[in-house]
Amino acid sequence: MNAIWIAVAAVSLLGLAFGAILGYASRRFAVEDDPVVEKIDEILPQSQCGQCGYPGCRPYAEAISCNGEKINRCAPGGEAVMLKIAELLNVEAQPLDGEAQELTPARMVAVIDENNCIGCTKCIQACPVDAIVGATRAMHTVMSDLCTGCNLCVDPCPTHCISLQPVAETPDSWKWDLNTIPVRIIPVEHHA
């Protein structure tokens, strides 16, 4: 019994010593990240979709900060994210990436053909924003409000029952071209 207590005390002291050494080393040899990269990464939507041409949001933030990459390549974040990054970096706002607009003129969402879905959950595992719900061997469905249209769920599907379709336009999602709407200013007289 005495040998067990000696072993426990020895392992505890070793753990304490190694913990102290690692704690000191982590502070002494810490590498500071670029605070601008951190702020840009916080602004990005963290969908890790790769539509910007980078494998995730962090590499894209590093490319913006260090390599001068365009700030308009985040399709899921859209114009709101681009404007926040432009404000942070004190640069002029840019129109959204022309290539992305040509490829996807409308907002796209994944749609599952539920009659052919076998419930394998591969699409759920591939979705970076958890927009697909369902259980194993049960029908899956996409929550269109959360779907970013990143296309990452389409390829893993073994039955090819997932497709991207444009979102139906509603008065809320319609892009009003205010330059083509005739506007006439009518002077109003104030009566005292």
Curated annotation (Swiss-Prot):
[4Fe-4S] cluster 1 binds at residues 49, 52, 57, 74. Its EC number is 7.-.-.-. It comes from the Bacteria. The keyword Membrane applies. [4Fe-4S] cluster 2 binds at residues 117, 120, 123, 157. Its main location: membrane. [4Fe-4S] cluster 3 binds at residues 127, 147, 150, 153. GO terms for cellular component: plasma membrane. Residues 32-91 form the 4Fe-4S domain. It is an enzyme of class 7 (translocase). Residues 1-26 are annotated as: Hydrophobic. Keywords: 4Fe-4S, Cell inner membrane, Cell membrane, Electron transport, Iron, Iron-sulfur, Membrane, Metal-binding, Repeat, Translocase, Transport. Its cofactor is [4Fe-4S] cluster. Signal peptide: none annotated. Belongs to the 4Fe4S bacterial-type ferredoxin family. RnfB subfamily. The complex is composed of six subunits: RsxA, RsxB, RsxC, RsxD, RsxE and RsxG. NCBIfam families: PRK05113.1, rnfB. Part of a membrane-bound complex that couples electron transfer with translocation of ions across the membrane. Required to maintain the reduced state of SoxR. This is Ion-translocating oxidoreductase complex subunit B.
